[in-house]
């Protein structure tokens, strides 16, 4: 693994993420989601005409181009004969990421077909992690390496998906009025809250299972394996967020005015992710 490739992959991923967000804004505006009375407009500048739709689309395309240019050096990996080989796995992962960015709220519109949360679960967790590993490692990955990427990414998958789910929980009334199917609008307030609980709590269960596995299989000495429990330090933040979401639901079960859940979940994702990355590095 070479660190300059890791940082370059990180730099290339940022504009692609920005492109996905811009296309999401562009798609929402075209679909009329923000025209529904009572809808919470996360980008009122576009809806009010301060920023044109053409400018949003141009910015999204520009971000994709910048991401592609930054990623060009990553497609070449040193070969055994002293030359360079093409990084085909990275190309496949990059195309999957580009397809996802272009079809979340536009094109196929996975977001409006009740597939937004599972789509984000894998695309912004497993796929992103696999892309960074493929870009950073100079040797071919075996089957066990791909399995490890999948398993290690699962806690991150849950926490990135719950940010989107919290956003959808807030928008249940306006999404239903606009005829949009999201996981939250299909499940209803009670089912959406249960899923919110599951996505928040599963990462901690996975961390505990990981620690148990390390100890049972003696994959690491006990003092070293204890680092696996480091992400549990974020648990009080999760309890506070779940308590807030439950309190709002109990006050008005039919139409709970959930506000700020995505912001709180984003904070948990940041703290947990930082501790999780540190734990993996120390182990």
Short names for language-model regions:
Residues 118-133, 185-189, 263-276:
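Small-residue-rich segments of transmembrane alpha-helices in multi-pass membrane proteins
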Residues 120-172, 178, 190-193:
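Functional transmembrane core segments of multi-pass inner-membrane proteins
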Residues 44-141:
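Intramembrane alpha-helical segments
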Residues 1-26, 89-102, 144-166:
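Membrane-embedded alpha-helical segments that form the functional core of polytopic membrane enzymes
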Residues 212-283:
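Extended hydrophobic alpha-helices typical of membrane-associated regions
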Residues 36-82, 180-224, 263-272:
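Multi-pass membrane catalytic core of lipid/isoprenoid biosynthesis enzymes
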Residues 1-11, 69-90, 128-154, 205-227, ...:
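Helix-coil boundary and interhelical linker segments in multi-pass alpha-helical membrane proteins
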Residues 15-40, 161-184:
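Acidic (Asp/Glu-rich) catalytic motifs at the cytosolic membrane interface
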């Amino acid at each position: 693994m070479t660190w300059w490739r890791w940082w370059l992959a990180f730099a290339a991923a940022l504009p692609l993420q920005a492109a996905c967000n811009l296309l999401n804004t562009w798609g929402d505006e075209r679909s009329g989601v923000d025209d529904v009375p009572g809808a919470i407009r996360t980008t009122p500048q576009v809806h009010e005409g301060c920023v044109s739709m053409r400018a949003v689309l141009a910015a999204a395309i520009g971000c994709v181009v910048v991401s592609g240019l930054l990623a060009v050096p990553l497609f070449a990996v040193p070969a055994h004969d002293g030359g360079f080989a093409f990084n085909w796995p990275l190309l496949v992962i990059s195309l999957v990421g580009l397809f996802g960015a272009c079809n979340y709220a536009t094109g196929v519109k996975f977001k409006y077909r009740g597939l937004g949360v599972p789509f984000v679960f894998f695309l912004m967790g497993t796929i992103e992690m696999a892309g960074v590993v493929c870009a950073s490692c100079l040797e071919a990955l075996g089957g066990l390496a791909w399995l490890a990427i999948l398993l290690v990414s699962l806690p991150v998958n849950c926490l990135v998906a719950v940010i989107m789910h919290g956003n959808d929980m807030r928008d249940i009334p306006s999404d239903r009025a606009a005829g949009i199917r999201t996981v939250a609008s299909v499940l209803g307030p009670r089912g959406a809250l249960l899923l919110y609980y599951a996505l928040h709590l599963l990462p901690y269960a996975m961390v505990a299972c990981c620690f148990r596995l390390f100890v049972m299989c003696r994959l690491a000495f006990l003092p070293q394996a204890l680092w696996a429990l480091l992400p549990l330090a974020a648990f009080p933040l999760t309890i506070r967020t779940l308590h807030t979401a439950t309190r709002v639901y109990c006050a008005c079960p039919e139409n709970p005015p959930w506000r700020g859940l995505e912001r709180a979940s984003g904070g948990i994702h940041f703290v947990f992710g930082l501790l999780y990355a540190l734990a993996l590095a120390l182990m």
